[in-house]
Amino acid sequence: MKVFREYTTALKAGVSAAAVMLAVTPAAFANHHNDTAQTSVESPVHEANLQIEVDSRMAGAVQDLFIQEDFAELFGADATEGELMLARSAYAQRLFEPVWTYDGVDGLLEAVASVGRYGVVLGDEDRQRISILADRRFTGGDAADRARADILLTAEWFDLMARIGGPLENMGEATASQTNAPARSELVVLLERSGQGDVRSSAEHVAPQAAQFQMLQAELERYQMIAARGGWMAIPDADDALEPGMTDARVPALRERMIAEGYYTAGDLLERTTEFFAQNDAVEAETVSVTTETTLTEDTDSDLEAEAEAPDFNEWYITYDETLADAVEAFQEQHGLEIDGVLGPNTLEALNESVGSKVDRIRAAMDFWREQGDMGERFVWANVPSFTAEGWANNQREISMRAIFGLPSRATPIFSDEIEYAVANPRWYAPVSIVSRDKIPHMQEDPSYAARNGYTIVDRETGSTVAAETVDWYADNAGSRYQFIQAPGDNNALGELKIIFPNQHSVYLHGTPSVHLFDRAQRAFSSGCVRLENPVDMAMWVAGDDFESMEDLQEALDDSELRRVDFENNVPVHITYVTVTVAEDGHARFWRDVYNRENSIRMEERVAPLWEPQDEPAAEIAQMSSVAAGSL
């Protein structure tokens, strides 16, 4: 009874049960089991534990699994110490009563059935295994079998929560407090509530709270609905690009492709159909008038001329008009392509990606947010495939700008760090790698290159400035021996500002004199650092309420003074590689895999047929009208 008294005292004092129960030896567990065999249902200890109805045989069977050290084995080799600690805590607080009720099992099965909304894919084996355990929990042969099923269901719950919310290791780390309670101990409460039937709210609690994840959820649902409707067919390839105003047999297929993904609306189709009918009606009226007159004059040539003016359906139907071109431009903008409305190779490739491929890419993006974890209340997010850098605060995008990242051969590294300071009007100390690859070839061709571009050359061995004309630029050690230092100014490679987060990669955010490159859709041009379209705006955003730093920066910029300004608070910065993001309009952006790291893009195998001229186009016109009306 000693363990009971300790537990009751601790419970009344508000101390976690886990701190007591997890510290008890197996022998103490055994003594506790023997003592509790005679405990009545009305035990005050049980009343303090949510008034749970006692099944002493089940509680004893669960406790036996603790004593026999089978508990961890039931969770499997993949279970973390944190998960095991939390599970032990949950059962200890219940005095080993089973977690899962009828409602809880139903809720777990419902959560398994709807887990796809979180971008999680469960196999048939997973679903079947959980279903069998749910049945065994209440219909197992004896108490031991039912107890084992209950613990296995708890293990499945932890696995499901990890799949939805990401790794749970941090949720199970012990704190250094007196109670030694597990961190994120609310998972014990969530497990308790799930066992009573509220699994859905537990899933919502552990799911990533990042705005991007939640917007990706909505887009996942939208693209799954598109897939359920049959997706789209690939547009046939051709030797020549299709430009606005041209006629092409692929135009009807392009129109259908735009409709399928929502870029070309029912209203657009209905308006275009109405336009054709209006043209036809006008010409028919004119033809009747001319025919009447020719009856009186018997001038059949005029009649033929009027009839010849009737709009040709086939030509009209395959004309790449302005409305469709606008839809293609919107598609290009949302896929990181040059926005010109031209159906060229890159646009055609993006159009022909299958809807299933896009669904998988959205899921992969959701997986990223699961693995990334909490990025902080205020952070800078620089994403390579989207060529953007953004400032986020309280789950809101507050600043966004175009960015330039490393060439595929000099890829920008993916990592997280903290911004500490900025430098106004910086000098640029060219890294040895850039000197060897870029500067030495220029110097070999023209030694005046350094002076023309504002570089001072320093001999690393002597520390002295040297004249370019006196150096053997063909020497094997030229790249490592000579340091290139570029003075501040309009041509400085770092622009007017650099933002520093000390790291092993020597990567930072900075400006650039080559601002014209920001107009390019694909912006992998740097040697690894991140060039910002508006570095000053980003630095001011990082400063936040640190008005002194903001004033110091602005003063240094105004005076063209080289100055380091330390921020009052460090701000996390995350350089990532995610090929699907969601813009403020709520629509997904599918970026090109610029570093070929995902290799997950799949093309649609079904190819749309080319349009064939119709002698009787009435059926096609009727179909257009019905499609338009049906999708309004």
What does each of the following model-derived ranges do?
Residues K2-A30:
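Gram-negative bacterial Sec-dependent N-terminal signal peptides
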Residues K2-V3, F29-G82, A155-D159, Q178-S185, ...:
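Well-ordered beta-sheet/strand-loop patches within structured domains
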Residues E6-T8, V15, V99, L108, ...:
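Hydrophobic alpha-helical segments and their boundary regions
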